[in-house]
Amino acid sequence: MEGTEARQRRLEGCGRLKELGPLPSHDAGRLPKASEEGHLAVSESQLVDAKSLEAPPGRETSLIIGFQVVIPFLLAGVGLSWAGLLLNYFQHWPVFKDVKDLMTLVPPLVGLKGNLEMTLASRLSTSANTGQIDDRQERYKIISSNLAVVQVQATVVGLLAAVASLMLGTVSHEEFDWSKVALLCTSSVITAFLAALALGILMICIVIGARKFGVNPDNIATPIAASLGDLITLSILALMSSFFYSHKDTWYLTPLVCVGFLALTPLWLFIAKQNPPIMKILKYGWFPIILAMIISSFGGLILSKTISKHEFKGMAVLTPVMCGVGGNLVAIQTSRISTFLHMWSTPGVLPVQMKRFWPNPCFIFCSSEINSVSARVLLFLVVPGHLIFFYLICLVEGQSVTNSKIFILLYLVAGVVQVVILLYLAEVTVRLTWHQALDPDNHCIPYLTGLGDLLGTSLLALCFFLDWLLRGRANLQELVSELVSVPP
């Protein structure tokens, strides 16, 4: 099977080949045959002992995982809270008021940043944990090719995100202004390009630093990226779009800049070709990112339709937090499961305890298996995390969001429901992609973060709507009781 030799080298680098025994040999491009039940037909020599899936003494426990995750998670939440405050501020800028599709563009563009950086962080974390970046020459090769691939993806999908936002916005617009189309496309491409470059360099520094200090990069890389990612992306988008809006009379400026950034694509392709395994991402990795962008665009449509309505006051502030927390936690879990499979199995071969594609939710959240332990830790962070971030937002911008007890309860329930769904789907999608000999780092995280954006935006809008209904009903009952108590 393609990739078996590479995986064997990774296992040898980790010193775990003895524990696993010899790796199975398959013909190139062929997978193990599936059983009649749809599960893998795995020989006894290929099965991983069930005990190895449990957290052994001296390895990662819930306390260790929680200790490594909680600080980056809180930092990420602070960054997401500030991103929400910025979005609430930017929505009043002239360019956001005049170019309505800019607000529709926010979730897919922020989600694109998240998809690219989280998949990059996950790939680099897997490379670090399997010892591939310990060699200086190999490290340079992996880093440069990964950065180049991210730049190509950011440029192309940034343009597609603008097109998707325009298509969704066309339904509600009567006229089609080409100057606004050029502004939206150029702002999207530049934002995606610069944000991907800045965050990619940050990810590289974090993963290499974590490796040197003996910290698992899977636990800290994606949260730290999220702590600055939304801030950087929103700031660049607002500044670039405002700049081009102020120079809208110079008709050739936006097309010229957009073409200039697109013209850099061959350079990134040349750099990426230096590492053939990474180059495969450009051949087969487009569909997950584009589909995730489309899913996020529907979340952006919900945001643009609700953000200016009185009953949804606070939607702009809380959307980055709700979407970001869910996407953050599921990216951590996906990266951990992916690393686990890279270290303990080979592509196409699932460990015996993971052979079911649709596992029992109780196994996902209540077993002693190491991935179940991490799922519980991440789930336990949701409620206290959201309370802290909500409190910070109320301190800074209390008048922009309702703080009724009913809404807070609905908000917390929505956050838990979102993360439970995403963590379960993380386990399912990783198993399915690994069964197909695909890398979960590249194929699962985009789907899950895109779905997290749509779920987060939808559930948050539902919270505001239910709170408005319940408060309206309570006010109506209070008014009726006052009228009844008034003497004739």
UniProtKB/Swiss-Prot annotation:
<feature type="transmembrane region" description="Helical">
    <location>
        <begin position="284"/>
        <end position="304"/>
    </location>
</feature>
<feature type="compositionally biased region" description="Basic and acidic residues">
    <location>
        <begin position="27"/>
        <end position="36"/>
    </location>
</feature>
<keyword id="KW-0812">Transmembrane</keyword>
<feature type="transmembrane region" description="Helical">
    <location>
        <begin position="220"/>
        <end position="240"/>
    </location>
</feature>
<comment type="function">
    <text>Na(+)/Mg(2+) ion exchanger that acts as a predominant Mg(2+) efflux system at the mitochondrial inner membrane.</text>
</comment>
<dbReference type="GO" id="GO:0045016">
    <property type="term" value="P:mitochondrial magnesium ion transmembrane transport"/>
</dbReference>
<keyword id="KW-0999">Mitochondrion inner membrane</keyword>
<keyword id="KW-0496">Mitochondrion</keyword>
<feature type="compositionally biased region" description="Basic and acidic residues">
    <location>
        <begin position="1"/>
        <end position="19"/>
    </location>
</feature>
<dbReference type="GO" id="GO:0005743">
    <property type="term" value="C:mitochondrial inner membrane"/>
</dbReference>
<keyword id="KW-1133">Transmembrane helix</keyword>
<feature type="transmembrane region" description="Helical">
    <location>
        <begin position="450"/>
        <end position="470"/>
    </location>
</feature>
<protein>
    <recommendedName>
        <fullName>Solute carrier family 41 member 3</fullName>
    </recommendedName>
</protein>
<feature type="region of interest" description="Disordered">
    <location>
        <begin position="1"/>
        <end position="36"/>
    </location>
</feature>
<feature type="transmembrane region" description="Helical">
    <location>
        <begin position="147"/>
        <end position="167"/>
    </location>
</feature>
<feature type="transmembrane region" description="Helical">
    <location>
        <begin position="189"/>
        <end position="209"/>
    </location>
</feature>
<dbReference type="InterPro" id="IPR045349">
    <property type="entry name" value="SLC41A1-3"/>
</dbReference>
<feature type="transmembrane region" description="Helical">
    <location>
        <begin position="377"/>
        <end position="397"/>
    </location>
</feature>
<dbReference type="Pfam" id="PF01769">
    <property type="entry name" value="MgtE"/>
</dbReference>
<comment type="similarity">
    <text>Belongs to the SLC41A transporter family.</text>
</comment>
<keyword id="KW-0813">Transport</keyword>
<dbReference type="InterPro" id="IPR036739">
    <property type="entry name" value="SLC41_membr_dom_sf"/>
</dbReference>
<feature type="transmembrane region" description="Helical">
    <location>
        <begin position="406"/>
        <end position="426"/>
    </location>
</feature>
<keyword id="KW-0406">Ion transport</keyword>
<keyword id="KW-0460">Magnesium</keyword>
<dbReference type="GO" id="GO:0061768">
    <property type="term" value="F:magnesium:sodium antiporter activity"/>
</dbReference>
<feature type="transmembrane region" description="Helical">
    <location>
        <begin position="63"/>
        <end position="83"/>
    </location>
</feature>
<keyword id="KW-0472">Membrane</keyword>
<feature type="transmembrane region" description="Helical">
    <location>
        <begin position="251"/>
        <end position="271"/>
    </location>
</feature>
<dbReference type="InterPro" id="IPR006667">
    <property type="entry name" value="SLC41_membr_dom"/>
</dbReference>
